[in-house]
């Protein structure tokens, strides 16, 4: 889809259409926000977060949120955008009991771990 490929102009058109559900899931329960976050498409993540119909805490079939996907892949700019959105819960866990900070640490993404540690909303266990 457009979000997965980073096509911001197409995402803008789709979000303008009230008939389009921005939280619709694809295979494995991925939403547009999860796909954009996983690929590191910061401009698309920005567009999606600006839309109040987007639920940034939705989780895939295995419980990964957009923040967890960005943390797994080490996309620091996307993690920054997600943490800045007051709706994002940084402490949600996937089915393996892992939070975004755990995933970033396991994948050795030090810059993402530092961002998460600096955020007061992140609970350090």
Feature roles, as predicted:
Residues 16, 24, 35-36, 50, ...:
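Intrinsically disordered, low-complexity regions enriched in serine, threonine, proline
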């Amino acid at each position: 889809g457009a979000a997965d490929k980073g096509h911001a102009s197409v995402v803008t058109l789709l979000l303008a259409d009230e008939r389009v559900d921005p939280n619709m899931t694809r295979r494995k329960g991925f939403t547009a926000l999860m796909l954009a976050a996983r690929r590191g498409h910061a401009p698309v993540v920005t567009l999606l977060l600006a839309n109040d119909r987007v639920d940034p805490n939705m989780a895939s079939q295995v419980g990964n949120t957009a923040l967890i996907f960005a943390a797994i892949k080490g996309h620091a700019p996307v993690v920054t955008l997600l943490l800045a959105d007051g709706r994002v819960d940084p402490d949600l866990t996937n089915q393996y009991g892992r939070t975004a900070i755990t995933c970033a640490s396991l994948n050795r993404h030090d810059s993402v771990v530092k961002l998460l540690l600096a955020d007061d909303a992140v609970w350090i266990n």
